[in-house]
Amino acid sequence: VILHGILGSGANWARFSRDLALLHPTWGVMAVDLRLHGRSSSGSPPDRLESCVEDVLALASQLGYRVEAAIGHSFGSKIALQLGTSVESIRHVISIDADPGPVDLTGIDREQVPVLRLIDGIRRIQKTGFSTRREFDQFLESSGFGEAVAGWVGKNLVRSDGRWQFQLDIDRVEAMLLDQHHFDAWPLVQSSSCERISFCIGGKSKVVSEASRNRLEDLQVQQPGRIRVEIFEGAGHWVHIDAADDLLQFVSERMLD
């Protein structure tokens, strides 16, 4: 199962999922839309990581799937870690450019945090929407976001009454994000309840702090085989876009380990 980041969707991972399935035809690959995202329903509050875990398990049960690996990008990584340390059938967890520790934003202006700035921008224009997709792209550009973010967030736009609009409960989405910020996944990483945990980090990304990188590398030495840290030097936060082939090769080989 592949779990996207906040304000993303399973469609962000469509190419990667297809390529992984082509490499391993006997594997089933499921790139989900998390609650409040993409084509998924809103689900019932509370909007916490635990609720997302329950949603994924309910979907897998409904489809009759046995989940054996969880891949999570950014926000999705802590869901993947919770799945991997609570579901016996899951042998592999792969965290993509996400810090396992809590994120402390105390005293930091929201404008200085890109994802919060993006949420605030969507909140401002949510009622009016956009006449064209190009207008949406220009809005993001004026807010300091590039083409990659437009492609990622734009998967949540729907056509309604002649305009492109976000059908998002942005306050609930932010509640999910803040719960993820508060959650400390280090105890899950250091436990022995998941057989293999890998951390794929964009070399140009600042999401995983230097202290966390050092801690992960120490764990890799202490628990060889179980913990693996892989730095994708040319990649930023969107490793699956910036280093698509290298990430695909790593995931493919690691899950055969």
Residue ranges and their predicted role:
Residues I2-G5, A31:
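Structural cue for short, hydrophobic secondary-structure segments
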Residues G5-A11, S74:
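Active-site glycine-rich loops that stabilize anionic/oxyanionic intermediates
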Residues L7, L34-G38, P100, G236-V239:
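Alpha/beta-hydrolase active-site loop signature
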Residues A14, A21-I71, F75, T106, ...:
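Active-site loop/oxyanion-hole signature of alpha/beta-hydrolase fold enzymes
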Residues L81-T85, S89-F130:
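Flexible "cap/lid" loop of the alpha/beta hydrolase fold
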Residues K127-D179:
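Conserved alpha/beta-hydrolase catalytic His-Asp/Glu region
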Residues D161-P224, R228-I231:
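Conserved serine/cysteine hydrolase catalytic core
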Residues F232-L248:
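Catalytic histidine-centered segment of alpha/beta-hydrolase-like enzymes
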